[in-house]
């Protein structure tokens, strides 16, 4: 599903643990790390897409996390010219994303990268809050900075409510 401007609707998922560290996934067969993300299907809300992608890419259920916040508006990034598939119609020039900040309620053992035949990630780590901005592929750095800046204000919700169901 590509919009009229050539952007694919997508959700980005930032998972924070009790120590304030973020889930950081190593892409399969690549020397690249990123947050979980995925497309929003037709007739699917961004939040529904988050929980589907969370299960597909990280193996977590909605009960394993708490939604702490989301970006108010879509954030966009353009793909580098060499990654644009001009033979595909409609042509996708980038992604527009709603980002969600999720607090991890479960233990790390619940994380399972092998829920799909072809997993998105082959490894993962907990990293400091701002590490992803400098370490994601360059064309995503601005969107990561925008999302982390906007969602940082929601971090307090995780610790002030503690992990009470």
From Swiss-Prot:
Its cofactor is a divalent metal cation. Its EC number is 3.6.1.-. Coiled coil: none annotated. Pfam families: NUDIX. A motif (Nudix box) lies at residues 38-59. InterPro entries: Nudix_hydrolase, NUDIX_hydrolase-like_dom_sf, NUDIX_hydrolase_CS, NUDIX_hydrolase_dom, RppH. Accelerates the degradation of transcripts by removing pyrophosphate from the 5'-end of triphosphorylated RNA, leading to a more labile monophosphorylated state that can stimulate subsequent ribonuclease cleavage. PANTHER family: ADP-RIBOSE PYROPHOSPHATASE, DIHYDRONEOPTERIN TRIPHOSPHATE DIPHOSPHATASE. This is RNA pyrophosphohydrolase. It comes from Hydrogenovibrio crunogenus (strain DSM 25203 / XCL-2) (Thiomicrospira crunogena). The lineage of its organism: Bacteria, Pseudomonadati, Pseudomonadota, Gammaproteobacteria, Thiotrichales.
């Amino acid at each position: 599903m590509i919009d009229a401007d050539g952007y694919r609707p997508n959700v980005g998922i930032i998972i924070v643990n009790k120590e304030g560290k973020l889930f950081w996934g190593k892409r399969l067969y690549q020397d690249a790390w990123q947050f979980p993300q995925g497309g929003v299907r037709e007739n699917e809300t961004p939040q529904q897409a988050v929980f589907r992608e969370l299960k597909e890419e990280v193996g977590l259920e909605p009960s394993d996390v708490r939604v702490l916040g989301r970006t108010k508006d879509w954030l966009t990034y353009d793909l580098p010219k060499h990654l644009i598939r001009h033979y595909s119609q409609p042509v996708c020039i980038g992604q527009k994303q709603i980002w969600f900040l999720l607090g991890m309620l479960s233990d790390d053992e619940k994380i399972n990268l092998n829920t799909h035949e072809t997993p998105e990630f082959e490894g993962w780590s907990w990293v400091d809050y701002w590490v992803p901005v400098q370490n994601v592929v360059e064309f995503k750095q601005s969107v990561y900075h925008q999302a982390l800046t906007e969602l940082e204000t929601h971090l307090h919700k995780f610790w002030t409510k503690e992990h009470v169901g």
